[in-house]
Amino acid sequence: MLTWSSLSTKIAQRISQWSNDAFFALGWRQMRSVLAAPGQRILVYHGLDQRGETALNGRFLSAARFEEQVRFLSENAHIVALSDYFSGNFDQNQFAVAITFDDGQRNNRQYAVPVLDKYAAPATFFLTSAAGRDAEWLWMDFLDVATRLAPATIEIGGRRFTKKTWRHTRYFADENGRKLVDWARYSPWSFVQAMETALLNAGAWNKAEHWTTYWELLASAEIREMAANPRVTIGAHGHTHQDLAYLSPEEARLELKYCKDFLEKTTGQPVPALAYPFGTYTRQLVEMAAQMGFSQQLALDFLFPEDHTDHRLRERMCMNPFISDGNQWLAVKKGQY
């Protein structure tokens, strides 16, 4: 629920962003100087397309904007490999940035890899083992596209969900207003399967070919090809992209094991890096993952006090398609929006 406090915070943030844009436009602030001081940040991208579509979700940037951001970073910061970021193997007098991509969509290979090659920029791509189970999509991407194409109401497991729109169109449960994406995230896998079946039966996927950029995943051969590129490192992102923090320890262990085994077999390389789906985890998960060989673990925000001194764990910042690049670099510098 949007409270007055959160609304006033958003208004103040928007005014600050407008002011920053004006300062950059008038030349009162130079964008190239924003990252001039020493610092470090891990950036998270997801999907790239031709136009920077934000109608489905907030996870896509245009390929042109991504290239401009990599160009800026290559000229005004130090882009480092994730392994070097973890080990501190970079010039501490510069602003160090590690680039990461989550989810393993095919558009990463089409749009991101050529840019990385052009600017000699390393990046880590965190993939699920969807290709190993012959899955055509990740459930969140399926839901985003299907919601756009599906009827106004849908019934799943005896619950009725109705579409509502603010920035994005979403399904909400009639009984309590909870978003369908949250039902899927926090429910057993059987609910996700029931959701997909209900949306498919409702004809939600009949025109999905027009939206392939937003759900198609990398095939095993494409993963193998990317892994052979010296700019690319492959990391793990779970088996089915479930929220590991809400699974039993054994279910979470299998999610990690299936993913790690598949990626290592496919690439012929060790996979020591793990990005937690949704950025959530528990301390038990951190220990379990470390025992499985994940020495580089990535959250979004730290969740526990001891995380700050845990050399196996780092925070990341998701890139925001709704703000200007000037405001994006200011946020990267501060580590928050």
Locate the predicted segments by residue:
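Metal-dependent polysaccharide deacetylase catalytic core of the NodB/CE4 family, i.e.
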Residues: L48-D49, Y119-T280, H311-R314
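C-terminal active-site subregion of NodB/CE4 polysaccharide deacetylases
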Residues: L2-T100, N107, L138, F142-D144, ...
